[in-house]
């Protein structure tokens, strides 16, 4: 039984974008295989949202910069006495491999953007009920095709995202592991601290307290206000302990 709930909050725009991309790709895979209209619309809606995120900024450039930054951090750690140099060298090799893979890949989302079925469904998703069979006969026929054929098509779409997912998974994993959780205490539901140039806040709260955080701030300073899930009858303890990692 789950006893704690984890919250993650970005402290800059690049991290906000990366977390959204991670979430959307997870959602794309959540209802696979695509076997009916419900799972199809769930899949295509998240594909469309992902393409919208790609169009708002140069995600690949930001990821390549982060790969370089992580390599520099590993290089500085390699000079610390007693560190596992073999592990550091292995991580640096993985970072270089992902950098090469990402640089060699086509523009992010280009294959998905040019696919006729994805483009047609994406256009209709903004219309309430706009994906009926009379609106999208192509989708209707596709959903009536053998499951094996749809699986091949969906897997080919997902494969075009592999350079991105491999890179993003490693970057987020390194960032999340960069700082341990430490016990903190809020007073009257409020807590603030310096960000120390962190990219990401991670909070673990006891589920039984039925609280959630409202977080504001940036990499230099942040503030957290805890709110009761039940806005009418819930209350926030005068002193509330939680776990916090500034990554």
Swiss-Prot record:
Per UniProt, what is one Pfam family of this protein?
A: ZapD
Listed A to Z, the keywords are: Cell cycle, Cell division, Cytoplasm, Septation
List, alphabetically, the SUPFAM superfamilies matched: YacF-like (SSF160950)
Q: Which InterPro entries match?
A: ZapD, ZapD_C, ZapD_sf
According to its UniProt entry, the protein's GO biological process terms are:
division septum assembly; FtsZ-dependent cytokinesis
Function noted in UniProt: Cell division factor that enhances FtsZ-ring assembly. Directly interacts with FtsZ and promotes bundling of FtsZ protofilaments, with a reduction in FtsZ GTPase activity.
| Similarity field | Belongs to the ZapD family.
Q: What is this protein called?
A: Cell division protein ZapD
Record the organism: Cronobacter sakazakii (strain ATCC BAA-894) (Enterobacter sakazakii)
* Gene name linked to the record: zapD
